[in-house]
Amino acid sequence: MIHEVAHQIAFNCGVHNRFSTVPKWTSEGLATLCETRGVYNFKKFPSIRDRINRSRLESFRRLKAAGKTDGRLLELLQSDRLFETEPEVAYAVSWAISFYLNENRQAEYMDYLRKDARRGDFLKHSRLDRVGFFVRHFGKNIEGLEKRMNIFVESIK
């Protein structure tokens, strides 16, 4: 339920634009972040341990061990198709990258979300547009970013 409420709040408060094509990894990743008490009640639960979504972490680790997450970040950046073909993988990687960015590159992540919400109404973004927009905020070494994300997620206790 908190996940769906997070979507509504994000759209109602302008974090996402209802009239724009929001990359699904962005909206679902943010909603999965909000499923934890450390995000929705951060004053009472300020520890990073309270911000870790344990079920998403377990899912990501299981899928990674099975070799199903490697290279999927670029795929998510290019299109939303992975949510149709392998939704568990899509949600796991969306949570992992969102958690990594929120914990390690928060200013850039917030800037990305802010600018994504202002990209214009009723625009369809090509695969190149979607990746280019991400690269402008986080750099062109997507493979390196994915490696750093994996190291970070693997380090979580």
Regions found by a protein language model. Give the residues of each.
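Active-site recognition of the HExxH zinc-binding catalytic motif
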Residues: 1-12, 31-32, 98
